[in-house]
């Protein structure tokens, strides 16, 4: 499994590789704009940043067009930070049920990037509990700086690219 932050970069790197190696799972881990939904459905197997109705509707539409089912994580803004993406906890239930019941998209878990304030465990625990309340099995949380803490809270996907490849320019 591999992750990419940007659709354009993924297209330039992975289009040919995935044709020759269809068993590779490609994860969209960055912010996904709704106008990139068509390309995202064609390229990716997982989307970790589902966070609004327009995006969900576009992704569902292109899944039907391309006859492809992706796996989704709803991105939760766990602390309602103004500068972070994600759906608020107060809207999570309605958004989740709309996605699975109306759009019939395969939401497999929640994703969050908590504040980097030394209290990440509190947020990881909260996300784990929300995930369980919705009956979901997968959790996408933990990055290079805090993935060890996230592992204590049943995370199944971590993003550790900067630990492996270094920081982006």
What is each of the regions a protein language model found here?
Residues 151, 164-169:
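Expand to "…catalyze enediolate/carbanion chemistry for C-C bond making/breaking, isomerization
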Residues 1-138, 143-145, 153:
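Conserved alpha/beta-domain cores
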């Amino acid at each position: 499994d591999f992750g990419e932050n940007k659709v354009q970069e993924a297209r330039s790197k992975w289009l040919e590789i995935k044709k020759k190696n269809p068993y590779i799972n490609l994860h969209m881990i960055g912010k996904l704009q709704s106008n990139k939904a068509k390309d995202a459905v064609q390229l990716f197997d997982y989307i970790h940043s589902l966070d609004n109705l327009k995006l969900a509707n576009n992704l569902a539409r292109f899944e039907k067009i391309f006859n492809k089912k992706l796996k989704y994580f709803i991105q939760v803004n766990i602390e309602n930070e103004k500068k972070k993406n994600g759906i608020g906890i107060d809207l999570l239930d309605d958004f989740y049920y709309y996605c699975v019941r109306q759009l019939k998209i395969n939401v497999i878990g929640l994703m969050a990037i908590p504040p980097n304030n030394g209290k990440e465990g509190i947020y990881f625990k909260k996300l784990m509990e929300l995930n369980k309340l919705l009956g979901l099995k997968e959790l996408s949380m933990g990055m290079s700086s805090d993935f060890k803490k996230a592992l204590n809270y049943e995370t199944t996907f971590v993003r550790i690219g900067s630990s492996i490849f270094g920081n982006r320019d």
